[in-house]
Amino acid sequence: MALTMLNGLLIKDSSPPMLHQISKTPQLDAFNYQSCFMQDLFAHFPEVLFIHRTYNPRGKVLYTFLVDGPRVQVEGPLARAVYFAIPTNEDARGLAQMFQVFKKFNPAWERVNTILVDPHFLLLPTLTMEFPTAEVLLSAFHICKFLQGKFYQLPLEQPVQRLLLSSLQSTMCSATAGNLRKLYTLLNNCIPSSRLPELHSHWLLNDRIWLAHRWRSRAQSSRYFQSLEIMAHILSQFFGTTPFEKQGMASVFRYMQQNSSDKASLSLAETPQDSHTPSEASAENPNTEQLVEARIQHSLNAICTGPAAQLCLGELAVVQKSMHLIGSGSEKMSIQILEDTHTVQPQPPASCSCYFNQAFHLPCRHILAMLSARQQVLQPDMLPAQWTSGCASSLDSILGSKWSASLDKHLAVTLLTEEVGRLLQHCSEEEFERRYSTLRELADNWIGPYEQVQL
């Protein structure tokens, strides 16, 4: 097959881009892309290479290479991206070809010291063969995502699930040996022994993994994970939802063009045959629906923090492509978008049964579709306070604060008190009396009957 430029994309840069494609069909057989800006960025920071993989419905995988490490001070979800590639096949030969193309255009590859990968990356021998002087490690971000997924998959009670997710988030932002050991112990206590091997909890005790991440402060860790979460969501949204690799990559490049903070000099223009899809043609004549969506976009930017707005705007982009209201009632609405059907609870704070809303507690594509259908906009009481723009400064001060033993104890007591109170409120009268008597007996035995304990 002939080597051709990617149909439908023109990347403007100071010198010709390095872009390779095999095949003229919407399904790319192989694809490698690096702009001169990306090449220059990698040349400046080659020491640590972060590899993220995104699969589409056809099973093709997009490899995104990002620079990482203490010297990299670049903001934006895709600002650290230095290479995009889709191998012909995800086997030893296909990956070897992909890495060899990368090395051909990047002489600085010899200075790569560390490569961070996800736990499902199986072709490690190929990676070590192509980068013989680099140490290959699991990335803290991918371990975090792996454990999060397991917590949602395992049949855990909600209080236990919330405790594990909260502890995981706290540990990732302060990955000291002590905190990792605490999380390891918590997993051993909360996860059934038969399912514990699935979690690979021994990763938490591998200090070499965490040395590559531990240099970050608590605030830096929070921003780092948030940025990578948004990056993964963007790639999944644009590339992972379409079986056509060409269309997926065009969407990724379009996002990078529209978000100048990610890559200011990247621009994209479409060929005539691709530039007038039905949805884009209708955009030339704004109607009521489009005006409503514009108002929703404005309300997101006005109410949410920057990262929250970016996540929700990505969800809104899906709504703009395809939305179908399949049922409506006074209490609940059923929203179907593309392949998903989920139940939306519109009363503040709005909630949805989809993973995005359950994980981030932010307005998802289904909630935004509901707002669009009702010609409404986002209201501040529809999302948690920590995601509102007014709370951004207070969050930064909390994330930047130092840990203290007294605060840790206070938080533990507060969480326990809230959980006990919740359990007492949501039980029968008979169960309440039994639980209250048990608590009364525990309190009296602990402090002594000579001192009345207020329960």
UniProtKB/Swiss-Prot annotation:
Superkingdom of source: Eukaryota
Designated gene of the protein: Zswim1
Keyword Metal-binding attached: yes
Single GO MF descriptor: zinc ion binding
Entry GO terms, CC: nucleus
Keywords (A to Z) from UniProt: Metal-binding, Zinc, Zinc-finger
Positions of region (Disordered): 264-288
Protein name per its UniProtKB record: Zinc finger SWIM domain-containing protein 1
Entry keyword DNA damage: no
InterPro entries noted in UniProt: Zinc_finger_SWIM, Znf_SWIM, ZSWIM1-3_helical, ZSWIM1-3_RNaseH-like, ZSWIM1/3_C
Zinc finger extent (SWIM-type): 333-375
